[in-house]
Curated annotation (Swiss-Prot):
This is Insulin-like growth factor 2. SUPFAM superfamilies: Insulin-like (SSF56994). Residues 65-85 are annotated as: A. Residues 1-24 form the signal peptide. Belongs to the insulin family. Proteolytically processed by PCSK4, proIGF2 is cleaved at Arg-128 and Arg-92 to generate big-IGF2 and mature IGF2.
């Protein structure tokens, strides 16, 4: 009861195809250059945007940009994220800038023409 040469070759090729797929899927990093690097950064960073060199606070002794990091060497997702810009505060995100007025804060208008009656009288004088 032997296995034919064709079946054993088919099993071997199937195993090799499966193994190569798994190894490629678990490869942690790859080289990215040119438009592929820019597209990947846009995908990773999204609306935040990105820098081609790291911000000054994250620079090591030897300053390298993302091209040196990812095109000439392999880079992973964590390294790509270090080049993302910090998100800008949106106009709708005002929770930190809201000032709470005390209950005893005066609520009367301050200024010459803030009171409606004063403004109305001035307007009537101009019409005359």
């Amino acid at each position: 009861m032997g296995i034919s040469m064709g079946k054993s070759m088919l099993v071997l090729l199937t195993f090799l195809a499966f193994a190569s797929c798994c190894i490629a899927a678990y490869r942690p990093s790859e080289t990215l250059c040119g438009g592929e690097l820019v597209d990947t950064l846009q995908f990773v960073c999204g609306d935040r945007g990105f820098y081609f060199s790291r911000p000054a606070s994250r620079v090591s002794r030897r300053s390298r940009g993302i091209v040196e990091e990812c095109c000439f060497r392999s880079c992973d997702l964590a390294l790509l994220e270090t080049y993302c810009a910090t998100p800008a505060k949106s106009e709708r995100d005002v929770s930190a800038s809201l000032a709470v007025l005390p209950d005893n804060f005066p609520r009367y208008p301050v200024g010459k023409f803030f009171q409606y009656d004063t403004w109305r009288q001035s307007t009537q004088r101009l019409r005359r």
